[in-house]
């Protein structure tokens, strides 16, 4: 029997999908990311979405101003695609190094997505330009047709929208974000080097029974929603396979406690404080610790064409207790796994 490792040293990871919000929420949640992760792909779905180079530069400056002293962190900005976005704005931002990627939200698919795209074929000229300049397209992969069951929206998106995009633009780099289904995992595994996917800790650790059986747990509610166990197991198998098409993207999405614990609660899991220990715990359960570094720190940079980080982080087998809540002015934010203990801690 192989002895369990007591320490894990990996290249410093990056988070390829995060919501940092703005103002007081930004300054509250950012340190949990900037302490551990070197870079993060920052989602553009603020209340006023990031659709211009100027707004991206201003948001990046607000993020950098909130990074605590001693943390080395680079926010990678994204452009929010809309029905009327000017292709010139997109290409200028990418060529100037302001935009790392562009984000496609189908209109009304998730938080602050009302400005999203309602007619995806109508923005094919943008995709053509992105393919030409090598700019990645990040996709929230759910259809928004009210007639489609919420648990089926990701699988339907593959057939109706994603496959036609890939057929039309075969060399467009696409990240299928926060995948939640066996359909998506199989689709990415069957793809090529132009298709990647991020996977969150909550979708690896939990399924819809954890959220709904014995009482509703609003702090596990996110979009895309947790699916049945068979889908969870497929995601776990995908990351344990060692395929370089899957990489770390927490989709950490904080909301104030009262906005989660309400009669119509918001979607989003604030997992940044526990993200790396949570991923390590999953990979250990899967006997796949040999693939943890690639998932966290190598596959993402390779897909984006960016250098891997030079420095390392160390995980130690020391119990790590998640706080019950984190102060947010006069309110609070409830973190993922609140009050629970993980086997791994990041060595400070």
From Swiss-Prot:
Pathway: Pyrimidine metabolism; UMP biosynthesis via de novo pathway; (S)-dihydroorotate from bicarbonate: step 3/3. Zn(2+) 1 binds at residues 17, 19, 103, 251. PROSITE patterns: DIHYDROOROTASE_2. It is an enzyme of class 3 (hydrolase). The active site is at residue 251. Coiled coil: none annotated. Substrate binds at residues 19-21, 45, 140, 223, 255, 267. Belongs to the metallo-dependent hydrolases superfamily. DHOase family. Class II DHOase subfamily. Binds 2 Zn(2+) ions per subunit. One of its GO terms (cellular component) is cytoplasm. This is Dihydroorotase. Disulfide bonds: none annotated. Its EC number is 3.5.2.3. Catalyzes the reversible cyclization of carbamoyl aspartate to dihydroorotate. Zn(2+) 2 binds at residues 103, 140, 178. Keywords: Hydrolase, Metal-binding, Pyrimidine biosynthesis, Zinc. GO terms for molecular function: dihydroorotase activity; zinc ion binding. Pfam families: Amidohydro_1.
């Amino acid at each position: 029997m192989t002895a369990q490792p007591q320490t894990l040293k990996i290249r410093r990871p990056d988070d390829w999908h995060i919501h940092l919000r703005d103002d007081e929420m930004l300054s509250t949640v950012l340190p949990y990311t900037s302490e551990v992760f070197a870079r993060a792909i920052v989602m553009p779905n603020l209340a006023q979405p990031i659709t211009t180079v100027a707004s991206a530069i201003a948001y990046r400056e607000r993020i950098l101003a909130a990074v605590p002293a001693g943390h080395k962190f680079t926010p990678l900005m994204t452009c929010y695609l809309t029905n009327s976005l000017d292709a010139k704005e997109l290409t200028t931002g990418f060529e100037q190094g302001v935009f790392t990627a562009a984000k496609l939200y189908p209109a009304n698919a998730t938080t602050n997505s009302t400005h999203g795209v309602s007619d995806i074929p109508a923005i094919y000229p943008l995709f053509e330009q992105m393919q030409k300049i090598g700019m990645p397209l990040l996709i929230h992969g759910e259809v928004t047709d009210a007639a489609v069951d919420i648990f089926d929206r990701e699988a339907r998106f593959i057939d109706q929208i994603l496959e036609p995009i890939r057929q039309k633009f075969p060399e467009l780099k696409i990240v299928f974000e926060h995948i939640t289904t066996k359909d998506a995992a199989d689709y990415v595994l069957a793809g090529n080097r132009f298709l990647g996917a991020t996977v969150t800790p909550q979708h690896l650790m939990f399924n819809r029974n954890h959220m709904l059986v014995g009482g509703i747990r609003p702090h596990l509610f996110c979009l895309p929603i947790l699916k049945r166990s068979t889908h969870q197991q497929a995601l776990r198998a995908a990351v344990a396979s060692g395929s370089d098409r899957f990489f770390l993207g927490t989709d950490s999405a904080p909301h104030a406690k009262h906005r989660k614990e309400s009669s119509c609660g918001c979607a989003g899991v604030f997992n940044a404080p526990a993200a790396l220990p949570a991923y390590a715990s999953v990979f250990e359960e899967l006997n796949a610790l040999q693939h943890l570094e690639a998932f966290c720190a190598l596959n993402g940079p390779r897909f984006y064409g960016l250098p891997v980080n030079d420095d390392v982080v160390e995980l130690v087998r020391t119990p790590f207790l998640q706080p019950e809540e984190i102060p947010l002015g006069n309110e609070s934010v409830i973190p993922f796994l609140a009050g629970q203990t993980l086997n791994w801690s990041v060595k400070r």
